[in-house]
């Protein structure tokens, strides 16, 4: 399993853990190294262990963390392993009630009723969709996984999520040289109502590229 622990600037002030739900990934996003292979889905205990290990390895007292986030957004598509993810979140919510839990997903074509029901039951769970492009055509090239929601369908799921939980869902958009025009922004605004969705903007980090280099590219795009 791959898990990443972030510190901003001290663990007590803010701790973010990104953990995996699968070994490899069946989705095959073109920018992701994990998409080249898929081995298996993790059990709930294996997902929870990643969080426990990150905290214990750095001797972090989770109860003292002021801003604590646990995100399933490393290897794997979490909603293609939902039964085990649900069990893992139930355990994590019990062990770390001060942690915000986040599902980051490309939006596979599944039944979202159990997902939203879990988010109603566990009040710390957030939902983020990896949108990345302003049209389905461009997104299909970046994420060539057939069994996924369209952008319009993602928007509709987000509206249901807000209505049922009272919490805004997120969409993530990877900015690059070819999708940052005003026309792209207008398309995104038409699809994802700001009264419903929160937006996060990121940059695609190539497999052989450092995070620092990727950040430099994002700053260039934003300037």
Report each predicted region and the residues it spans.
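Generic structural motif recognizing short loop/turn segments at the entrances and edges of beta-strands
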Residues: 1, 13-15, 123
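Conserved AdoMet/S-adenosylmethionine-binding subsite of the radical SAM
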Residues: 56-69, 74-222
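A short loop-to-beta-strand scaffold at the N-terminal edge of the catalytic core in hydrolase folds
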Residues: 2-6
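Canonical Radical SAM [4Fe-4S] cluster-binding loop centered on the CxxxCxxC motif
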Residues: 7-49, 53
